[in-house]
A protein has these predicted regions:
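Conserved phosphate-binding/catalytic region of the ribokinase-like
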Residues: 1-19, 33-37, 49-52, 252-364
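Hydrophobic anchor at the start of a short beta-strand
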Residues: 5, 111-112, 139, 212-214, ...
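Short beta-strand/turn micro-motifs composed of small residues
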Residues: 9, 115-118, 217, 266
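Short Gly/aromatic-enriched secondary-structure transition segments
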Residues: 20-29
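Substrate-binding N-lobe of the ribokinase-like
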Residues: 35-151, 344, 362-363
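Short acidic-glycine loop/turn motifs at beta-strand connectors
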Residues: 110, 157-160, 274-281
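Conserved phosphate-binding/catalytic loop of the ribokinase/pfkB sugar-kinase fold
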Residues: 113, 143-144, 152-199
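Conserved beta-alpha-beta core of the PfkB/ribokinase-like small-molecule kinase fold
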Residues: 188-261, 267-278
């Protein structure tokens, strides 16, 4: 099935910094898997300090050739309750790659991306456009004249499982609610709003013309008190997020009842789906993580691989989102296939997703 997928969300420059050990002591809980906004503090030196409001600091000895930043980055909020003091880690390697959930979903779904960039002469915007071209992603952009493109410092502990994207934002946040209207009149099989501010996502998902509507939030969407996710949950056919994001949402039970399908992923613990069966009964399915015989190389993009494979499987098997119900067997089939896709992407350290044929082979 060839889906006409339209993805509204960011494409970032991801400056990926891989480190040699967990970002928090294992005794304090599972690996970090959340995004946080940051601001540059004092610059200079050989190390990079990530400091949250509670005073917890991760000090990173930077690898050879690191292009910056160095010095201190102030995180907007704490990254783990109970974490105090300093933790020293060493940078192993770094790379610049294409990032952003919009770019990820557009690639995984073979869809068209609609995103915001800075002006034509903005260096980061130029790099992002080049990376989109290199990945052969079809895209259209809104140029924001007075903001540089958004970018991310992504700190990954690789096999230890931490993924801490630190965002330097402003470009997409500057958009008006109707900025994407020229494209919202186009009919499509699937419309995805990925990691955009809630006020933008609500406008995109409530517009007519899409057979299926997916919301892929970031942590900031769950924390948004000015525009609650519950206020537009009725416009969402599939909401897919990780457990830490889900548990941050204050009115999550209201949201769970208003979306057609909720999927919560939990890394090596597997995933949970909540939905309504054709008999009108509430359905719940848990599926374990797909078995692996080696540690992950990188956990970045596992969530996008899972959600994109899950929804494409449902639609290819004839699910009708307008009905508001779905058969349990179909949900289980889609979750198993999605778990395999997420497991395969753990072997990648670069931008990309497993082909359907690779998923088929893994499931044999």
């Amino acid at each position: 099935m060839n889906l006409r997928a339209m993805v509204f969300g960011p494409a970032y420059l991801d400056r990926v910094l891989r480190v040699d050990r967990p970002l928090v002591a294992p005794a304090l809980g599972p690996p970090i898997d959340q995004s946080v906004d940051g601001s540059l503090g004092f610059a200079g030196g050989r190390n990079l300090e990530l400091t949250d409001p509670s005073g917890y600091t991760i000090e990173i000895a930077l690898p050879s050739g690191w292009p910056g930043p160095s010095g201190r980055i102030e995180l907007e909020r704490g990254i783990r309750a109970g974490a105090t003091g300093r933790r020293a880690v060493s940078g192993l390697s770094w790379t610049d790659d294409l990032g952003g959930m919009g770019a990820g979903y557009a690639t995984a779904l073979a869809g068209t991306l609609y995103c915001a960039l800075g002006p034509e002469d903005d260096p980061i915007s130029q790099v992002i456009a080049s990376l989109l071209d290199r990945q052969a992603i079809a895209y259209s952009t809104i140029r924001v004249a007075d903001h540089g493109a958004d970018w991310t410092l992504l700190v990954s502990s690789g096999m230890h499982g931490d993924k801490l994207p630190i965002g330097f934002r402003g470009c997409h946040a500057a958009l008006a609610a109707g900025s994407f209207d020229p494209w919202l009149s186009l009919p499509c099989d699937l419309r995805v709003a990925a990691a955009l501010p809630n006020r933008l996502a609500a406008h995109i998902l409530s517009a007519p013309g899409a057979s299926c509507r997916v919301f892929a939030p970031a942590m900031r969407n769950m924390r948004d008190q000015a525009y609650l996710l519950s206020s537009f949950a009725g416009s969402i056919d599939l909401l897919c997020c990780n457990r830490q994001e889900w548990e941050t949402l204050d009115d999550r039970e209201e949201v769970a009842w208003r979306v057609s399908i909720l999927v919560v992923t939990d890394g090596p613990s597997g995933s949970l789906a909540r939905f309504t069966t054709p008999q009108g009964e509430p359905g719940t399915i848990r599926v374990p993580a797909f078995p692996r015989n080696r540690p992950p190389r990188d956990t970045n993009r596992a969530g996008e691989a899972f959600a994109a494979t899950f929804i494409s499987t449902l639609l290819s098997q004839g699910w009708q989102p307008a009905s508001g119900v779905v058969a349990a067997d179909l949900v289980r089939q889609a979750m198993i296939r999605a778990a395999a896709a997420a497991a395969l992407v753990l072997d990648r350290t670069d931008f990309g997703f497993p082909a359907p044929e690779a998923i088929d082979i893994a499931l044999r």
